[in-house]
Design a protein with these regions (language model features):
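Extracytoplasmic "Venus flytrap"/periplasmic binding protein-like
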Residues: 70-138, 173-175, 182, 269, ...
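Short, low-complexity disordered leader/linker segments with a strong preference
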Residues: 1-48, 69, 429-432, 436-446
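Extracytoplasmic "Venus flytrap"
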Residues: 41-62, 83-86, 160, 400-405
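Hinge/lid segment of periplasmic solute-binding proteins
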Residues: 109-161, 172, 185-189, 196-198, ...
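Short, well-ordered beta-strand elements
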Residues: 42-54, 76-81, 104-105, 153, ...
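Short, polar/charged alpha-helical segment
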Residues: 54-76, 117, 413
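C-terminal lobe and pocket-closing loops
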Residues: 114-116, 284-295, 308-411, 444
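Glycine-centered hinge/linker elements that transmit conformational signals in sensory
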Residues: 190-193, 229-259, 304
Length: 446
């Protein structure tokens, strides 16, 4: 039965959007870029940037200072606004749809990117020409994520190289060297030994996020999308979920606290030594340093186990692109600034030294700067990137920015993963049903 009255929450959302549109329209009416508005008194070009992460703001503050030092004749003044994730996404979408009130530069989380590129005219500036000189040194899967019809519209902060983080206190007690774990079968067998000898779980199974699943999919060179339709029931994807489900059935894994591995409840459990390992991207190092102090000096990282010969040993997961919007002024300068800050050698190194991320330029992974002492090398040792460099050309990716991906991912996380992991539903049957449901939504544009 249809509800006759909108809920208070829905009314509040409508009012919020109305006020956002009104305020942005008013801002647009009064701010058509005059020289007084785009230049400071001393001649610097003024830009605004929106982001949803404070440390990203710290990075861009440094980037602007570095740019001004290196380009005395092209000085800029960067005003950075940090907003909560949902608020920023909603505000940015309204601004770009209305054509007024948006920033010159913005961060767009990878899962949101496809929302902006559905049309033939995305609201971002094409950076292909500016990025091209750097392409030989960039991890391809990272530029592919933000490429639409051959045009590059954004650059990421990191690769998101997926790793296995082993708690060596537990692994040593079980008598297992992670270097001997080559395949997922090896991993499961090692987990049985860990459980038997230490009573600890080998790992966890997510019920509300797909970090482990999607890394397994990408390493097999599969995808969740094929020709714009749902590809969830592909054999490789079925195998990935059956493998995770089997870890629960054999008792070497339990469902993750909070439903996934990137929340404070889970950090506390891992910090207490409840798990021998966790599969997460390289940016998870910052979570360990910040939330798992007891494990300092006790973590060993490796690439992913494989299913079969020819599989990749990692996947690039997560991400946030920095874009230049179509409301920017002096877009040529804005693009040069963003690209040099992200893809240039100095800027790429700073994604590690400031943010603790694995740079999108793989040629800097073995540089002295990335081995220099900091809070990350104190925690993990100085050979982090030497280890990752061994599989830098084996980082798979998914079609996350495909227009169909958000619908498919939503179906999977909402109607599939919880059933498979919590209720032990049949993997293949569930994924086939999800394909049908997702394709119906894709066809309807929902």
């Amino acid at each position: 039965m249809k509800k006759e009255f909108a809920s208070p929450r829905k009314l509040l959302s409508v009012l919020l959007i109305f006020f956002l549109v009104s305020s942005l329209a008013l801002a647009g009416c009064s701010s058509k870029n005059s020289s007084a508005e785009t230049k400071t008194k001393d001649g610097k070009t003024k830009y605004t940037m929106w982001t949803f992460v404070q440390v990203h703001a710290d990075y861009w503050k440094d980037a602007a200072e570095t740019w001004n030092k290196n380009h005395p004749k092209q000085q800029i003044e960067l005003k950075i606004n940090v907003l909560p994730f949902d608020q920023m996404n909603q505000k940015l979408q309204v601004a770009l749809n209305s054509g007024n009130g948006g920033p010159d530069i913005a961060d767009v989380e990878i899962g949101q990117f496809a929302k902006y590129t559905k049309s033939n005219n995305p609201p971002f500036k094409d950076m292909t020409k500016e990025v091209e000189p750097f392409v030989p040194n960039l991890v391809k899967s990272r530029t592919d994520n933000y490429t639409v019809d051959g045009k590059i519209y954004g650059l990421d902060y990191h690769v998101g190289t997926t790793l296995v983080y082993y708690n060596m206190d537990i692994m040593n007690k079980a008598g297992i060297d992670p270097a001997t774990i080559k395949t997922w079968d090896d991993y499961i067998n090692a987990g049985k030994v860990v459980k038997e000898k230490t009573g600890k779980y080998m790992t966890s199974a997510e019920t509300s996020a797909g970090f482990v699943f999607t890394s397994m999919v990408a390493q097999q060179k599969s995808d969740l999308v094929k020709d714009g339709k749902s590809n969830l029931s592909a054999p490789e994807n079925v195998k990935a979920l059956q493998t995770i489900q089997s870890m629960l059935k054999t008792g070497i894994a339990k469902t993750a606290e909070g439903g996934h591995q990137d929340n404070e409840e889970y950090y506390a459990a891992f910090n207490k030594g409840e798990y021998a390992s966790v599969v997460m991207p390289a940016w998870y190092m910052s979570r360990m340093v910040g939330f798992m102090p007891k494990l300092k000096g006790k973590i060993q990282i490796t690439g992913l186990p494989i299913f079969k010969e020819g599989d990749l040993r990692s996947a690039g997961l997560g991400g946030t692109a920095t874009v230049v919007t179509n409301q920017a002024h002096d877009t040529a300068l804005a693009k040069k600034f963003v690209v040099e800050s992200k893809a240039g050698k100095e800027g790429s190194i700073k994604t590690w030294t400031i943010l603790g991320f694995d740079p999108i330029r793989s040629d800097v992974w073995t540089s002295d700067e990335l081995a220099a002492p900091n809070k990350f090398t104190d925690y993990f040792g100085t050979d982090i990137f030497k280890q990752m460099a061994a599989f830098k050309d084996e980082v798979g990716g998914l079609s996350v920015t495909n227009n169909s991906y958000p619908i498919i991912n939503d179906e999977f996380l909402t109607n599939g993963l919880p059933k498979i992991m919590k209720k032990q539903a049949n993997v293949e049957d569930t994924l086939k049903a999800l394909d049908a449901a997702a394709d119906k939504r894709i066809a309807a544009g929902k």
